[in-house]
Amino acid sequence: DVVTPGSYTLSAFSTLFNALYTAGGINDMGTLREINVFRGGKSVAKIDVYDYIINGNNDGNIRLQDNDLIVVGPYDAIVSVGGKVKRPMRYEMKDDETLSKLLTFAGNFTGDAFTKNVRVIRKSGREYSVHTVEKDAFASFKLFDGDSIYVDSIIPRFSNMVEVKGAVFHPGMYETGGNINTVLDLIDAADGLR
């Protein structure tokens, strides 16, 4: 599943990635997760491009020899993740990978993400279903082809804030509790009335 399959003449120093580039790259149906190189009918290398991109592991990018065969099969599952993650996009997942692995691919949560749970939208027969996955189940929740994951943001409100506006010297937000327990304390914190 490459853009332009076929036989190619490459330099003696060419690697698996050079050959994939020459063939136009992997097409929309091809896998990035398990690319095999066969030599004399036996598998001599297997590469997961995600392992290379995310971890820098270049072990499977071997130098090719005459008559090597590169096999790029179809992907197992494509899922999308959006909302409050650092790299929201579509990712290819292997059969045994879970929501936790997807979040790692997506760079994990942003600073303003609601991390207690996430929503998974899944095709169920003729309609969609929504699954709320709690944080302690991330490592065991399996993903399937076509799943969409959404991470919400925290609620845009404060648990300990009061705001003063108007005829005070320093209007703005102030922490409640501690030194500010009454309206008079708040006016004092704002340096008094004008």
Model-inferred region functions:
Residues 1-194:
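Ser/Thr/Pro/Gly-biased, low-complexity, turn-/loop-rich segments
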